[in-house]
Amino acid sequence: MLQENLIKIYETSFRDNREMPALTDYFKGETFSYYEMAKEVAKLHLLFKKAGIRQGDKIALIGRNNPRWCITYIATTTYGAVIVPILQDFTPADIIHIINHSESRMLFLGDNFWDNIEEEQIRQIEAVFSLTDFHTIYERDGKALTKFQRDILKNYRSKYPRGFSINDIKYPEIPNDQVILLNYTSGTTGYSKGVMLTVNNLTGNVIFAQRMINTQTGTFYFRKGGRTLSFLPLAHAYGCAFDFLSPLAVGGHITLLGKIPSPKILLEAMGVVRPTVICCVPMILEKVYRKQVMPMLEKGPMSIAVKIPLLNTAIYSVIRKKLLEAFGNNVDIFIVGGAPMNQETEAFLMKIKFPITIGYGMTECAPLISFTPDNEFKAGSCGRYLHEQLEVKIDSPDPQHEAGEIIVRGEHVMKGYYKNEKDTEKVLEPDGWLHTGDMATMDPDGTLYIRGRSKTMILSGSGQNIYPEEIEDKLNNMYLVLESLILETENGKLKALVVPDYEQAELEGVDKNDLPQIMQNNLTELNTLLAAYERVSELAIYPTEFEKTPKRSIKRYLYSPSLLTK
């Protein structure tokens, strides 16, 4: 158990950084200082007390990233209740299921989400509040809480007759082993599980983030006055930990985008906010590489210049400068996570010395398992496991050369799945070892190299392990391929389901009728890059992008080899 405590970390941060900006709504322009945020937290604590909320009670939260989403999260956890953040991409049926399964007593939501919920579908919810201004949307019995919120300023002044001072920023003692977060997974297996995370789990992640440093320059990634642009869903463990909880612990300024991050919106916001840390999924950088960098390198004078040893360094320097300018020209580090990164994109970014590192984690570890500063990052890896917080082993007779399942134990590992002993026992051993389901090799220094998911691994007829993700990575680099899936048929053959990049094809004037032949040419080229046992026998075009989870992982379970014949 760690000595530090997350609740006390925020108590200190709100006091020490009281005049600093904490949260900004990018489109509304509304900003809360740390002091103003602490006052809003205090008002919600009064509401919780009036409602009879006790430590351990559940409070559900759903909505776009905005300041009051963050305030609700912090108010709940510093009170000792359990926050249940729900991904806004979930279907109404899933949202209702999570509210009921978690036994939440209160619900805070964006106003538009209430249109999809009937009161009788969530009978244990006592009251619903708006994330627009915290007004009461619905109260099951009577109007006591509605009246209390209507008179919140009077109630607040009654509690703090001399005004709210920094000495009033004092939260109850909440032990590190207490559950304060119930995080429902994205359901890539088709079933959402409630991950029980403790004060200790979150503390471990935040403490590690506070110590993240470029060991060459001495620059701390998360620091007082640092800026982040939050565009990943905060209900997801990755975005929550590093776009929200970590900067808030050190006096960082979090700007919340609050809209779907289209390239146009995102790059405009980057120019305004000029973030010092950017947390993103690989797709963001992969799109920039494909749409902006590759065309320059493949056509025109630059395609010739990069092949000349003395010129290519200068060309790479120009590209690096332009990319950094596109992201606000102030960034110290791109922390990439949530999914594997395309190897070609990664290799290019490292070649131009782009400030990038790739981490690895999972919701069940709140989420971080491995991370390396960008100046120490090894190509193809996802960083070193966190030696101070975790033990990691590879279930393989030769972990350095033969992939095996990553197994983890330590400060970040969850208590289990809520009301689900059966699934908990499947992944969590009695002595605390968590089975991640991810296959990897590991260097002697603890650097991990992910190969794929154990559930997606295919065993060839000759006994060789085939990782579909590795083949997909190669195929996705080929001409006019947007994304792909490698599937195994009943007779053991590998077949590819490919989504063409229709937008790029149109820009280049490629006839749609030519796409099947282009994809067949890609298949021929792909097989020259693969071992004999990995070769793909057939390819079919899929007409639309694959359905994905909120963290942009393809929902593989929705797709079967039968689609290849349609």
Q: What is each residue range found by the language model?
A:
Residues 33-35, 180-207:
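Conserved AMP-binding A3 loop
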Residues 203-227, 234-321, 330:
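Conserved AMP-binding/adenylation subdomain of ANL enzymes
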Residues 276-279, 289-377:
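Gly/Ser/Thr-rich phosphate-binding loop
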Residues 393, 400-460:
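Conserved ATP-binding/catalytic segment of the ANL
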Residues 458, 483-486, 492, 523-566:
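Conserved C-terminal "lid"/linker of ANL adenylate-forming enzymes
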Residues 19, 154-184, 191, 217-227:
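Conserved pre-ATP/AMP-binding loop-to-beta segment of ANL
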Residues 22-52, 57-66, 70, 74, ...:
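Conserved AMP-binding/adenylate-forming core of the ANL superfamily
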Residues 51, 78-157, 502:
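Structural core segment of the AMP-binding/adenylate-forming
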